[in-house]
UniProtKB/Swiss-Prot annotation:
Keyword Cell division: yes
Family: Belongs to the ScpB family.
GO CC, one annotated term: cytoplasm
Pfam families: SMC_ScpB
Any single GO BP term: cell division
UniProt-listed SUPFAM superfamilies: Winged helix' DNA-binding domain
Subunit structure: Homodimer. Homodimerization may be required to stabilize the binding of ScpA to the Smc head domains. Component of a cohesin-like complex composed of ScpA, ScpB and the Smc homodimer, in which ScpA and ScpB bind to the head domain of Smc. The presence of the three proteins is required for the association of the complex with DNA.
Keywords, ordered alphabetically: Cell cycle, Cell division, Chromosome partition, Cytoplasm
PANTHER family: SEGREGATION AND CONDENSATION PROTEIN B (PTHR34298:SF2)
Annotated compartments: Cytoplasm
Job description of the protein: Participates in chromosomal partition during cell division. May act via the formation of a condensin-like complex containing Smc and ScpA that pull DNA away from mid-cell into both cell halves.
The name this protein goes by in its record: Segregation and condensation protein B
Stored HAMAP family: ScpB (MF_01804)
Length: 190
């Protein structure tokens, strides 16, 4: 199959799927190896991002999705009756930052770092699909572990968790959480 045909098929798959489409699924359908598929997708992403189009292809944790370009949000939003979600609280941003940099992590460890109860923030972040349960720790009581989701990556504009800004600290307990929250907010508002 020619590259141009493969690109057309990939474009159709990503568009039709709606949600982020896993690379493995693309490879399976087109019978491609991952290296070849990644190369083709990279070329497609570059083409979309650098052309005079209203859409782009985004990579999120080795999944691909078509999205409208951020600069056209004001126009796209008029198409929908967007229900404004209440902004996350300071506590929720703090918990989100702690989880992002320490995942998987237990609620007890989150509370130890923050020094206060974090039940409400964890519940709200779970409801927003920014964090999820990631199993249970193999210790007495089997506490739940939490990690960030693909939705977290999408909202903050990261391809993977490795794209988080590096912290210049040795101990998260010494971190000024306000600075980290502001850094997260800047990343999410690109």
């Amino acid at each position: 199959m020619e590259i141009s045909t493969i690109e057309c098929v990939i474009e159709s798959l990503i568009f039709s799927y709606g949600d982020p489409l896993p690379l493995d699924k693309i490879c399976e359908i087109l019978e491609l190896d991952k290296k070849t598929a990644r190369s083709i997708l990279k070329n497609m992403m570059d083409s979309y991002n650098n052309s005079n189009r209203g859409i782009i292809i985004r990579e999120i944790n080795e999944k691909y999705q078509m999205c409208s370009k951020p600069e056209y949000f004001d126009y796209v939003s008029k198409l929908y009756q967007i229900r404004q979600k209440q902004a996350l609280s300071q506590a929720a941003y703090e918990v989100l930052a702690i989880i992002a940099y320490n995942q998987p992590i237990t609620r007890a460890k989150i509370e130890q770092i923050r020094g206060v109860n974090s039940d409400s923030a964890v519940t709200r972040l779970t409801e927003r699909n920014l964090i999820k349960e990631a199993g249970k720790l193999d210790v007495p009581g089997r506490p739940r572990l939490y990690e960030t989701t693909d939705e977290f990556l999408r909202c903050f504009g990261f391809k993977s968790i490795r794209d988080l800004p590096l912290l210049d600290i040795d101990d998260l307990n010494e971190l000024n959480l306000q600075e980290l929250v502001e850094e997260f907010d800047e990343e999410g508002n690109k």
